[in-house]
Amino acid sequence: MNNHLELILENSLSTDVPLNLTEIINKFDDAVIETGDSETVPYYKDGHYHITVPKNETPETRVNVAFQLAYVIEYGKYLAGENPSKVTFANIACDPGCFEIALAILMPKQLYLETAQKLANDEGLFDATKLAEELQVPISYAIARSKNISSVTINRKDF
């Protein structure tokens, strides 16, 4: 992901607490919410990208919705002409560009750094499990985000 896109996401999603799925989607004025299975491919209809959100939010469904939004950001201009049956949710989840964008959506850099700093001990280490709980994401995603931010150190003993 390029720095310009990261900055845009950071500015639009800036917050000191993790946003819920509805709040995240509402930050994108050309997206509308559908209720259903979060492992769904987003589609374009009537001038809007349709993102599917489950009734109950979990860390895993937050990741799934972030991947849908990432797919729209990465490939949105092509969605209107595509046959949606050619793309599966697995394709989206395996796309490296979508992965980077999804991490930035779930954990904007400033929120990530502030949360990590709040949890850090005197040596600058923090528990990845607690970080994941605070950010409402699976542990593996919290650790993956740290790889893109040079000033973050994670104590991985518990992973």
Report each predicted region and the residues it spans.
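Active-site hotspot residues in diverse enzymes, especially metal/ion-binding acidic/histidine motifs
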Residues: 1-159
